[in-house]
């Protein structure tokens, strides 16, 4: 982990978060009962990390430096959506034949994240109630 690579990841993350904001704002007119901005971000981020990650592998059609892969895949995609990393890691598990692990990754992540959100909500609601 070099300082230069950290700077590239940070720059990509800044770009990714800006893109996330822009897409979220652009999606506001179509958002109704569903958070379409988030859905669009998660789907396009997952597609981008799968496309770029595969195309730029050492054995891919357009191999690039590890630094550029860090910039795009961890920086931009990570700032844009963490769901893309989750999706890629789940696909990697399935491609390696670890279907049970992939299933646990999906179900476990969703269940644990929902539980964590609930716990965070409950803790904050308790604090809010005490200060009212």
How would you describe each model-predicted region?
Residues 1-132:
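Membrane-interface helix-loop junctions in multi-pass transporters/channels
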């Amino acid at each position: 982990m070099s300082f230069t690579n950290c700077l590239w990841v940070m720059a990509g993350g800044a770009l990714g978060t800006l893109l996330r904001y822009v897409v979220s704002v652009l999606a506001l007119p179509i958002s109704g009962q569903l958070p379409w901005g988030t859905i669009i971000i998660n789907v396009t981020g997952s597609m981008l990390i799968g496309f770029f990650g595969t195309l730029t592998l050492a054995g891919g059609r357009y191999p690039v430096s590890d630094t550029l892969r860090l910039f795009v895949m961890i920086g931009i995609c990570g700032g844009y959506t963490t769901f893309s990393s989750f999706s890629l890691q789940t696909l990697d598990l399935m491609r390696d034949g670890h279907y049970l692990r992939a299933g646990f990754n999906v179900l476990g992540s969703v269940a644990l994240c929902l539980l964590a959100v609930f716990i965070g909500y409950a803790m904050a609601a308790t604090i809010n109630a005490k200060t009212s």
